Amino acid sequence: MNNFHRILYSNDEIIKQRNTKWYFAVIIFIVSVMLIATPFVSAKLLESPKSLMNQFKGVENGMIQALTDYDCQITNKTLDCQQEFSTYTNGDYQFFINVTEGQELDLPDKYVLFSQEVVTIFTRDGHLQGDYTLLDGTSFNELLELKEEENLDNQTLTGHLLQNISQSTLGTHIPQTYISVFIQYFIYVGLVSLVNMAINANRLKEKISFKQFVTMNILAMFSLALITAIIGLFSPVNATAIFPLLYMARVIMIYFKLLKSNQN
């Protein structure tokens, strides 16, 4: 493809390249999707103990109570407690300890659930779920000993526990994110291209095929996806909001450019 670099900034070039080979458009689409997904992935990777504690305010005292009152060992990524299932309330959170699979629970608005395989923290504003992968081989007593040895306060230790729980899902979170973004924009590009065809059916002298509209809409993604990925490394939340707005603006500009050039 000649003048590839020009599609990064030139809408005219995107229109000119609408007949490019299909496999090149597929490659551009896949790379763009990976770039668009970067903010979602980096948001997970950049989660800090402090940010997690801000999300789940007031959970720390109840977590320390769980470590203090229950004799539990994590072996082969499974929680093994000497005590039977029990529940207690600390602050705004209700805690469920040693929950077995299939056990029925009456869950409140805010809760922390330690099952044998998974930890879940839930509030109306968000939730966190993960397993014991990064805590494997430790016990509640050892975590308390670490707190004393390192002179950690309740918030700091709890923040690191939440981070370990969150990061345990990276192996599934990252591929799921890429697949989700791929499906989302596969449908989105197809729908936008169909709308382009419907609007332009009787307005353009030169007929533009569905494939050509798809190609133009894919080429329009690349530079914006690159910008999104760069911003996402520093500000994931802003990056995820910016791309759809920029992309739709560019698609509209290409549409009017195409309409103007086709009528001349």
Summary of predicted features, one role per range:
Residues 123, 171-178, 182, 239-247, ...:
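Alpha-helical propensity feature that highlights long, continuous alpha-helices across diverse contexts
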Residues 40, 192, 196-204, 228-232:
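Membrane-water interface at transmembrane helix exits
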Residues 1-56, 225, 230-232:
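Internal alpha-helical transmembrane segments
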Residues 50-167:
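Long, solvent-exposed extracytoplasmic domains/loops
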Residues 203-264:
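Alpha-helical transmembrane segments forming the membrane-embedded cores
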Residues 172-202:
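Selective detector of the "anchor" transmembrane alpha-helix that sits immediately C-terminal
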Residues 2-27, 162, 166-167, 203-212, ...:
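Membrane-interface extramembranous regions at the lipid-water interface
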Residues 38-42, 82-97, 236-253:
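Alpha-helical membrane-embedding segments
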